[in-house]
Amino acid sequence: MSGLLLKGINKVYPSGVQAVFNFCLDIRDKEFIVLVGPSGCGKSTTLRMIAGLEEISSGELYIDGKLVNDVVPKDRDIAMVFQNYALYPHMSVYDNMAFGLKLRKVPKEIIDQKVKAAAEILGITDYLSRKPKALSGGQRQRVALGRTIVREPKVFLLDEPLSNLDAKLRASMRTEISKLHARLATTFIYVTHDQIEAMTMGTRIVVMKDGFMQQVDTPQNLYDYPINLFVAGFIGTPQMNFFKCAKLVSEGKGKARKVYVSFIGNNKILLPGSVVARVKNIDEYLDTDKEITLGVRPEDIHQDQAFINTSPDTVVKARIEVIEKLGAETQIYCELDHESKESSVIDNSTQMIAKISSRAVINLKDIIDLAFDAHHIHLFDGYTEATILERDEGYEVISENAEGSAFVPPTPQEMRAQIDSARIVTKEMKAQMKKDKRMAKRTEAAAQKQAAEEAMKAESEEKTEENNDENKDAE
């Protein structure tokens, strides 16, 4: 078993900047958890705290039910793969993979067995005698993975391991890592800023922003049921179209009442009854001045006549500004304010992206009809940016996400208040931070010195053993 529990984890740097706020997550054994978000959101810091490379300012970290806040990295039984591979250039692939085991004084026969087994899994058996400089980026990354596999750790930590690879190799390595996870049946925690990597690899995904957790869920749930505007915009390529300052309006009364979303000029679309039934506290929004944001994914906007004929109440007119032919599909960038002569580069509130058939016959500046799939639209509160739609029977329920599915992230206003509050630092705090920083430098220097001495000692012992073996052979 190799589960992890993070309870109220916070990270505050000596400067007073808080990088992670109240991070809580229960990671089950054998899960593939992906931490995803834009640069600076705290995902790598969280991973480094799990590894023990960053001190936890407050909160508790448990591995297999054991509190490990004060346990040094080498005793946590975890292995980490870095973005830059971190291979020793003067050592062969074999020696790079075996180095950690040699430091632990594992017998030679077992080292040889584990290195060759890992090399077989990763398909690098033919490269064991080569130096890192003779390998491609993908091969180096496999060696870095192999070095962690031979240790047989409880948990694998991967910090943006594919970011240095080209697009084709990234796609290939995504598959390799997913296969490796299935084969090893071990807990993986993976950090990336690439939502495609997150969606294709993770059993659950943690979306982060500005140090705060936003949503913890399965890839499909994140796509279909984003909890707020940020998650909706971050997950999906191209990103979701947003129409702000929209309102819910009704026409008719009683059973004949129809509910529409009114947005941008005179555009409005009819909401199906199933969507209306999901709106939380609908009386707060319907026929009031309270604004909402309408979200529509590009793939839920249709240009084919058959769909338009069946959904006449969701049709809008738009002018085509850019056409991107991608072979299997075509992406069009449209201007909803089609009567204006030119679209604004600065103000994109009237612009949207649609995915249509690659067979569609269209031209630049054409004014065309587009129909929204109203069954798959998203509605968000105009102020808090939280979704105002309840989940329906399509929501994927899994036992691992019992707590995560109930998590409610802070609003942008609450996040800003906490960030500003964390930046208030007194003179006494600054003095203590400087003292802690000096102590941390001394500790790090001592650790580096000890590691270097251990490496030299291991190398010396290995040479001594080799000399003894040669002397025995000579005798």
Descriptions of predicted regions:
Residues 73-234:
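ABC ATPase nucleotide-binding domains
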Residues 36-38:
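The feature captures the beta-strand-to-loop junction immediately N-terminal to the Walker
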Residues 51:
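Helix-to-loop junction immediately C-terminal to a conserved catalytic motif
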Residues 59-67:
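Conserved ABC transporter NBD signature motif
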Residues 16-18:
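Short coil-to-beta microelement around the adenine-binding A-loop and adjacent beta1/P-loop entry
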Residues 251-475:
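Non-catalytic connector elements of ABC transporters
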Residues 57-60, 110, 210, 377:
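Conserved coupling/switch loops of ABC nucleotide-binding domains, chiefly the family-specific signature
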